[in-house]
Amino acid sequence: QALQRQPAATLVAGATDVGLWITKHTRAVADIVHIGDIDALKQIHNNDTALHIGAAVLLADLADVLGTWSPDIARVLSRFGGVQVRSRGTVGGNIANGSPIGDLAPLLIALNAQLSISGPSDPRTLALENFFLRYGEQDLQAGEFIDSILVPACDLDGFSCWKVSKRFDQDISAVLGAFNLVFEDESVREARICFGGMAGLPQRASACESALLGQPFNRDTLAAAKIALATDFEPLSDMRAT
């Protein structure tokens, strides 16, 4: 209701990033709506088909659950900022912020996550990879907000992810890569590969994926995928050295 009255308001839950807009970048934020204490948005539950994550679930609480899916996921989530950030920052906030170097988006895109979006019109579901339109722009209309994230249950035998940063922890990513391969008869049946820090938004490596699909998982295939990967992105040679 508050958002309907003030559709241009900035939503905050943990405010770990919005706080920096104000204190470090001296941005004027006129209207703020706090959603961090709404119980319906703080729920996280798992069943046989999917993990349902409320938008206001803390990053620390996400790590306790999603981290059990894969040792790689657990390692990446343990390096997310520091203890203070993980204890205040939220899943929905990290996604809605739209940062191209956010740690969650590449990982969740590789896991085929879906967003549940509420607003003045009917609720809608959107693939996370389609949420990011271009640098600084996300698919949210006035008065809309992310209410939850759904991660389908899947076989993670072919899943891996890693983070590169100047410090091991308490640092933002220079590059984060997430790789989710499904094998059948020693060939690659499905491939979802996503990077953060390689473009103006979290983005799948479509050429690399195509080079892997239907191919035997061997050195020759990986060499071809490596060549294809070089065509997927044109990273900036900026201060983050991506």
Report residues per predicted region.
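C-terminal structural segment of proteins
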Residues: Q1-A241
